[in-house]
């Protein structure tokens, strides 16, 4: 009978340890989600350059973002026809602001990016202006 109670105690301890471990992992996952940072970027294309800007993203930039740990959330053009050929809007996600800074530095220093940028701008700059806003999700946001 003593063996039975000893085994039951060990089994119970194992269950408690497993539950605590799972709770701890869930807490880490929540904290990780809470620290994710999003970046909203708006590019104002140079006149007549939106097609070239979209091509550069499609053919080069997106792959380089992924290479440097930049999670692409989505890309948009405004639905207003007057603005559609002027703006490219997109959102990236990162584990933290520090990770974003590190990723952008690596991206900008990447010889593949420099080559793609220079080739795409042989007939002039594609972008007149860039706006960037880093954002943290609210506690009620469905996306974190």
Predicted regions and their residues:
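An amphipathic, aromatic/His-enriched active-site/gating alpha helix that lines ligand/cofactor pockets
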Residues: 24-34, 55-73, 81, 93-134, ...
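Short, surface-exposed ligand-recognition loops at beta-strand->loop->(often short) alpha-helix junctions
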Residues: 45-54
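Bacterial N-terminal signal peptides that target proteins for export
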Residues: 1-9
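Bacterial N-terminal signal peptides
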Residues: 8-16
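Active-site-flanking beta-strand signature of metal-NTP-handling nucleotidyl enzymes
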Residues: 38-42, 89
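A short, glycine/Asx- and small/polar-enriched loop/turn
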Residues: 83-88
């Amino acid at each position: 009978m003593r063996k039975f109670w000893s085994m039951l105690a060990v089994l119970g301890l194992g269950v408690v340890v497993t539950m605590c471990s799972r709770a701890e992992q869930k807490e880490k996952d929540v904290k990780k989600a809470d620290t994710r940072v999003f970046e909203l970027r708006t590019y104002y294309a140079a006149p007549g350059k939106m097609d070239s800007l979209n091509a550069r993203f499609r053919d080069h930039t997106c792959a380089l973002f992924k290479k440097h740990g930049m999670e692409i959330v989505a890309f948009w053009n405004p639905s207003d026809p007057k603005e559609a050929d002027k703006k490219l809007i997109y959102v990236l996600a990162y584990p933290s602001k520090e990770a974003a800074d590190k990723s952008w530095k690596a991206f900008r220093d990447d010889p593949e990016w420099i080559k793609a940028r220079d080739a795409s701008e042989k007939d002039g700059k594609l972008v007149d202006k860039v706006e960037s806003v880093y954002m943290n999700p609210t506690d009620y946001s469905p996306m974190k």
